[in-house]
Amino acid sequence: MKRQKPFLNGLVIILLFSIVIVSIVIYLQRSPADDQAGREDDVPSEQHEQNEGKEEPNTKEPPELPMWYLDGPFELPIAGAAGYASVKQTLYEEPKADAAILSELAPGTPFEIREESGDYWLVETNSMSGWIEHRFAFINLPDVVPSILYNHTNSYDSRFKTSYLDIPELTGKALNPMIDFNERLEEEEYIMPILYQTAKKVFHAQQLALQNGDSLVIYETFRPRELQLLVNESMEKLAEENEEVAEGITGEPWSITWFINMNVSNHQRGLSLDLSLAEVNELTDQTIGDFKVLKVKDHTEYTMHTPIHELSAESAVFDRPIASADREGWKELEVNPEMTEPALKLQDYMVEAGFNPLASEWWHFNDVDALEDLKKEAGTGEFFIRETVNSTPQWEDITPTQ
């Protein structure tokens, strides 16, 4: 054992010498930034207090772009999307009901949505910005669910007919042009305003459709009160002159109000929509701002038992009327035997997403939850919508609620 001692002593000396050499190398390789960081640790406490009030620079690492938007209620973030006031809305300085009031937005006022905080949106109009309660606000569907097919025929060629006859002053007319160059999508697109809470259900229905090789085809969401009255008056006048038309909309058990509502309808409130269904022949993707979204490149619209907006009992879903707000009663009714399989599929998608069907029109669905939420506070649609105020979606604008 004594013979091994010189060897062990030598090994210890070599190890100590190596540690010293490594320490010297590390010291010499220290950067000025390291020295500065060390000195910052010695900053007096009062200077630390001054620094605490300073904002840290944005160190958010940029993701690989374009990216899929997977964390929100839509295909694209709401930041930058177009929105509209459906009623007179208070503009607050902060996102809370007791905040200072900046102004009021008139019904129909267009704005850009910038941020969401709880029950409020930060919005920007052409002249001001502030927070509004989004419960009463519309959002433009193409801005957040661009994969849906949109065809607002009332913008260029109204499909309204009754008993397959043209309705004077309506059929084939541009009754309500709702199309604009959409800065966000960088193309002309129809304007499809709908309540924010209802829009989330529409997105759900589109997801269900896409999973089964289909896509929604939306023809109309918001309809101005003035147009509603025009359709009603034209229908009544034609029915007075034509017995066939009268029988088609008033024969038992139906009445004209089942095809055109004489009162404020759910279209004016922003919680219903008219739509059809298409088979997707080719599905691809497209880039919008910093995001990738699905795009239906080719489709074939299904044939239903009547054309859309054929306002007569021929278009009925069930054998008799039932209140549109009845959540369960319609499930007990006899289905119109003329209903096609695609019409039944459309109903399945919409019902699973939270909508109620309308007994008299296969294309019309209501959001009863929104109706019960807003009650008499809902809008009456006494305005027109002609423009979009929006911007390209950017990843930096995403917040956890968007």
List PLM regions with ranges:
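Cell-envelope/glycan interface and biosynthesis
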Residues: 140-401
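SH3/SH3-like beta-barrel superfamily modules
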Residues: 68, 102-135
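N-terminal Sec-pathway targeting helices
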Residues: 2-16
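Boundary regions of SH3-family modules and the immediately adjacent low-complexity/disordered segments
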Residues: 38-76, 124-160, 172, 183-184, ...
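Envelope-exposed proteins and targeting segments
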Residues: 87, 119, 128, 271-273
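Short, basic/aromatic beta-hairpin or loop at an interaction surface
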Residues: 81-90
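Sec-dependent signal peptide cleavage junction
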Residues: 22-40
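Short alpha-helix capping/helix-loop boundary micro-motifs
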Residues: 94-100
